[in-house]
């Protein structure tokens, strides 16, 4: 339906312009048909820093064009027409999933025919298009179909390296010869990529790096022998069950042995870096070549993850040099924004050593550590740098923990931190900055404003032109007459917690309404943010039924509130969260008389499902109905890296694991509880649900349960799943938590 017709329909529903709230249709909410926003899509800045490229559909001819835009004036040029992305053997176009440029922008690597590996489509086929002669050919043709992973050009664009079936290969683009660099890859020896737990918890997928001179490949190797193997049963796709086996180290058990080494692109033996420490009880989550050098910069975490040791290893040697250690009594994080300064004399480093997360400048020998940002606020992430002006651009939000803004600071010398984002745009700002720091694609949104995307220039954050204002989506949102998300505060003891709230349709402040609380509550996420979330249409749908939507940010959540806020929960995950949720909703009821404390519901997914259970079991007088989805019932069941980071091992902290696990308090259930889990969840295993069910049955506790066959942690695969899930949730709320004002 075109916008004019859609708007007419809405106005008719509104009774000729009334601002009454439209009754949302759940099918349309799930299908994403109600508010449609436009974005930039995938883009890449080109090496000149003045142009960026995008993949765009060629509507007239079909297929995909690679198009460049000049940042200054939006001059558009088709760099590679869709007609070049054709398989000459078949005459058919090759679908473009994504592209990557060579360093000199002379060639493009095309990723296609992709397959999912756990979370993402990281396995597929690759083709190379050479702009000099317009040739287009597939690489790795001798390997099995859709088996290549993480292909990337050598620095001089003469070769491409890739992983296939746990081995690393290098293909010469001129001679088309292929050199196999590793030969020991197997089910248990993994070269150039990672096992399940490194991928999930360290975001490690691409496991090899080209040396700057193109003569060596450095890579990770994981030996999963001895790691516990988890079995998932597929009962729905064949007459007899199929078993999926994969190594999964649960808290306190044996990890894979991980090491790093380097090998010549001409072949030969791998030189392994001799980093001290048991490879099964230390982690190597990050490794990169220092720019324009033959040296590797390696981060090593100990198993408790409370120290991060930095090593430099030179090609030609197996002995690394230890230069720097960051440590914390709770845990430290890996550094993903390392930038080298002044001809590699210094590098940037993020640390919470001052009590706040800040960016530091560290000398190459690790002896001189100076703050680049400082103050009682958290640096969040680096956006880019202007090396000529000696500036770093970064995200922070000193005055409002739910928002995000761009700031700048000097890399050397003293100077005040300067806000760059416009003062009149309250919400969250994100940026894709050019390599020179001169231009950036800027996206602004807040809870009631769809993304507004413009090109800005620096210095000065000047808006050069609008790229997408999403005016149509804004009009669609406003035409619905939805209640806005409000941001308020609630107390938990002496702490002030951030809270967001949506009031029901036809709200009457003199009546009392039931509340549905959405919780996550664990260190890996945050739920109270002033950012566009598609209009919060699922929550708005439930609000339409006569509920108040609430989310409370408890201690330990990943909010920019300082080290103590985030790490006070160390060793006690699951304890403070439910305490803050209970205190928070009670304080809200003291502030707002329209909250009905006799009708409080709570729901969450993953860690939020765990906290839902903790709240239901430990505070049954506060929480009366709960829906727990894809939850961890016993913290011992989850993986080593995540659980031990925040809890240490079960052997070292048995009481913390007992107190933080919902299953410990299952006998406390008094209210209505719906358990939802996918049997194909490789992340939080269905075992977690079954163990809790077993315990609830033992205690004679009544509950409801929905199991989704072979759905993963997101419970979205297979036809009809998402709609069925949301319908089931809505039905349960309406049947067990009476809606409407009283």
Q: Whereabouts are the PLM-identified features?
A:
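Beta-propeller folds
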Residues: 9, 20-430, 438-439, 445-451, ...
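N-terminal signal peptide c-region/cleavage motif recognized by signal peptidases
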Residues: 15-17
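Serine-hydrolase catalytic core recognition
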Residues: 229, 285-286, 293, 422, ...
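Hydrophobic alpha-helical segments, principally membrane-spanning helices and signal/leader peptides
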Residues: 1, 196-198, 646, 663
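Bacterial N-terminal signal peptides that target proteins for export
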Residues: 1-7
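N-terminal alpha-helical segment
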Residues: 6, 22, 608-609
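Hydrophobic alpha-helical targeting segments used for export or membrane insertion
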Residues: 7-13
